[in-house]
Amino acid sequence: MNGFSTEEDSRDGPPAQAAPFFGQTCCLIDGGERCPRPAGNASFSKRVQKSISQKKLKLDIDKNVRHLYICDFHKNYIQSVRNKRKRKTSDDGGDSPEHETDIPEVDLFQLQVNTLRRYKRYYKLQTRPGLNKAQLAETVSRHFRNIPVNEKETLAYFIYMVKSNRSRLDQKSESSKQLEA
């Protein structure tokens, strides 16, 4: 089975109006009980299964269901547990103040392959040829997390833009108009 199902295969209960896939419900068993929530577009992959088993969560797939879609609640729950554990672990025990800041997780897998390739080309990232989208997204996200950012300057510029309803780009176009006149 490849995770896709037909309309006839997906009839595992009464159709729910909110479910995007013909009334499918979440394929997970949470604490011994089947999740009644409507399935979203997130699927229960081997990677998700591995992270669930590593985190010792009480989630399992229902073997009677013919699809692998999970609800948005469980998708967010799994992601939040994964991100919390990542932030808590550090080399120096996590007591330093720089580890207390909440680092947002950017999901670059949502980008198109061409965009990821353009990013790779722009920053001249060294990779082996023929990477698939997941490998390319992982390489790009590793680089993206390590880009130094001057937070003070960025915040000051943002506040300036909000207060003045302008940006530096607007100023450049105005100065070029003045030169033409």
Curated annotation (Swiss-Prot):
Zinc fingers (Atypical), renumbered ranges: 26-74
Residues spanned by motif Nuclear localization signal (NLS): 83-88
Keyword Transmembrane: no
Region (Important for DNA and phosphoinositide binding): 85-87
Matching Gene3D superfamilies: 3.40.1800.30, 6.10.160.20
Main location: nucleus
GO biological process, any: regulation of DNA-templated transcription
Gene Ontology molecular function, alphabetical: DNA binding; histone binding; non-sequence-specific DNA binding, bending; nucleosome binding; phosphatidylinositol-3-phosphate binding; phosphatidylinositol-4-phosphate binding; phosphatidylinositol-5-phosphate binding; transcription coregulator activity
Family matches, as InterPro entries: His_deAcase_SAP30/SAP30L, SAP30_C_sf, SAP30_Sin3-bd, SAP30_zn-finger
Pfam families associated with the record: SAP30_Sin3_bdg (PF13867), zf-SAP30 (PF13866)
Disulfide bonds: C26-C27, C35-C71
Subcellular location, record wording: Nucleus, Nucleolus
Keywords per UniProt: Disulfide bond, DNA-binding, Lipid-binding, Metal-binding, Nucleus, Repressor, Transcription, Transcription regulation, Zinc, Zinc-finger
Stretch list, region Disordered: 82-103
UniProt keyword Zinc present: yes
GO cellular component terms given for this protein: histone deacetylase complex; nucleolus
Family per record: Belongs to the SAP30 family.
Domain notes: The zinc-finger domain mediates direct interaction with DNA and phosphoinositol phosphates (phosphoinositol 3-phosphate, phosphoinositol 4-phosphate and phosphoinositol 5-phosphate). In vitro oxydation causes reversible disulfide bond formation between Cys residues in the zinc-finger domain and reversible loss of zinc ion binding.
Primary role: Functions as a transcription repressor, probably via its interaction with histone deacetylase complexes. Involved in the functional recruitment of the class 1 Sin3-histone deacetylase complex (HDAC) to the nucleolus. Binds DNA, apparently without sequence-specificity, and bends bound double-stranded DNA. Binds phosphoinositol phosphates (phosphoinositol 3-phosphate, phosphoinositol 4-phosphate and phosphoinositol 5-phosphate) via the same basic sequence motif that mediates DNA binding and nuclear import.
PANTHER family, A to Z: HISTONE DEACETYLASE COMPLEX SUBUNIT SAP30L, SAP30
Assembly and interaction partners: Interacts with components of the histone deacetylase complex sin3a, hdac1 and hdac2. Binds histones and nucleosomes.
Stated name of the protein: Histone deacetylase complex subunit SAP30L-A
